[in-house]
Amino acid sequence: YLPQHASLDSKFPVTATDVVLMGRLGTTSNIGFYNKEDHKAARHMLERVGLEKLQDRPLSALSGGQRQRVLIARALVSEPKLLLLDEPTSSLDDYVERELYDLLQELNKELTIIVVSHDIGFVSRYVQKVVCVNREVYIHPVGEIDENVIHGMYGEHVHMVRHDQEHNHG
């Protein structure tokens, strides 16, 4: 699970590897101590998310996108079958957001990923199905999200903007 806002004290002296290792707590009988397999798994997950060169960097020295990747590595290091992400890009710029969704798309080849997001237009380029919840549940293949679906979910005063097409702001 990756929460929308992880409560991490930026002054706490912990490295990227330390954070990923925390995901191994409870997966072995070595309570409080990490073995060689734990360290190997943490290194592997940092490689998977493209942060192997930053493994010894303090968490406080990482960008928002790098921190999100560390937290994803922490969630993955316990080898889950399901990854649940709550607004994983809420504080990221567009470029880092795309990078993160590209990573999730790659990871989705191996495990089920559920993403909670309010940005249906952007997210729909990366997912297989969209489930909208607003007093009712709407399940749609990605290609079927149109203005009728959006109006049914959010009311008449919402405009749909497609991120993959040019649009006027006027």
Predicted regions and their residues:
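Conserved ABC ATPase signature
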Residues: 58-62, 66
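Conserved catalytic loops of ABC-family nucleotide-binding domains
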Residues: 103-115, 119
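ABC ATPase nucleotide-binding domains
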Residues: 145-170
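Catalytic Walker B motif of ABC-type/P-loop ATPase nucleotide-binding domains
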Residues: 83-87
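Conserved ABC ATPase "signature" region
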Residues: 21, 36-54
